[in-house]
Design a protein with these regions (language model features):
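N-terminal, active-site-proximal structural segment of metallo-dependent hydrolase catalytic domains
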Residues: 2-129
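Soluble catalytic domains of enzymes that build or remodel membrane lipids, polysaccharides, and related
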Residues: 94-108, 119-288
């Protein structure tokens, strides 16, 4: 039985290693990129293979397990929440959320200064208490997963919905000149949607790069282990505010909701799961 398990763990570890390598070619072939998102599971397989090894393979699987854990633990240093900072909640609320009133109450209890909301059904009266508490801002009304809103308690200097093809993003600007972005590219579930997501991320990265001080939040439909996400960070000159292993989306518990900062002191943490398949992110920031 022990030899039986070792052999199958070894085969699983070889397949996991192949998946890690394949995922890094996702910029060239969209199905390959899908493999990149499951690094937490590959790490677990490498650990099991290292501690229940076939002869002569322990060192190899220990190396890959350690490398995977180091990747998952990035960024290694995260700042504490800045004192007196602005509070923003990003939340993909799910288009068909069955408990909008309860969700609204939970969001109001966070006492954030701003809300950025994805997949919000603006025709659902359960969200009206939020709109009353956050009367400023703008939204893209659409009965689809690409409805988007950026709401604020205080007036914003700018708030506009911009389109990249069929897909919106929001750029707002506070009175102190900080740019705020709410992003939600399409999921890469077909070649057409994968190409649209790649174009969306490339365009918003270029726009973000031109900002001296900015915060981008959203459901990127991309994990930190994707080469497209790495390219976005590089081209936008932004940095992530949550650790890569942080799960934000069910059912696979992957990290696809992000808060990315540029020229700001930022701290972010997940809030408890509610009635959506995503977790909210609470972000606090100040200028550097």
């Amino acid at each position: 039985m022990s030899a039986f398990i070792r052999l199958r763990l070894h085969i699983l570890a070889l397949l996991a290693l192949a998946a890690v390598i394949a995922g890094q070619f996702g910029s060239f072939f969209w199905p390959a990129e899908l493999f990149s998102h499951f690094l937490p599971y590959y790490a677990a397989i490498f650990i099991l293979a290292a501690f229940w090894p076939r002869p002569k393979w322990r060192t190899l699987w220990l190396v890959y397990a350690a490398a995977s854990l180091l990747w998952l633990a990035q960024p290694f240093i995260l700042p504490d929440a800045p004192s007196g900072g602005t509070r923003l909640v990003w939340y993909n609320v799910h288009l068909d959320n069955p408990a909008a009133e309860a969700e609204s109450a939970a969001l109001l209890a966070e006492q954030a200064d701003l809300l950025a909301l994805g997949e919000i059904n603006l025709d659902n009266p359960g969200w009206q208490s939020l709109r009353q508490a956050y009367p400023h801002g703008c939204q893209h009304r659409e009965h689809s997963p690409f409805a988007l809103a950026m709401w604020s308690k205080q007036p914003l200097a700018v708030c506009e919905v911009r389109m990249i093809g069929d897909y919106p993003y929001i750029r707002a600007q506070t009175a102190d000149g900080t740019a705020l972005y709410a992003l939600h590219p399409p999921p890469p579930i077909s070649s057409e949607l994968a190409e649209a997501r790649q174009h969306y991320l490339a365009e918003t990265a270029r726009t973000l790069a031109a900002e001296p001080r900015a915060l981008a939040v959203g459901d990127f439909n991309s994990s930190p282990f994707s080469p497209l996400f790495a390219r976005f960070l590089q081209e936008s000159s932004s940095r992530p505010a949550t650790r890569y292993f942080t799960p934000t989306w069910k059912p696979f518990f992957l990290n696809i909701d992000h808060a990315l900062a540029k020229g700001l002191n930022v701290s972010a943490r997940t809030l408890p799961w509610q009635h959506s398949d995503h977790r909210p992110l609470l972000v606090e920031y100040t200028g550097q």
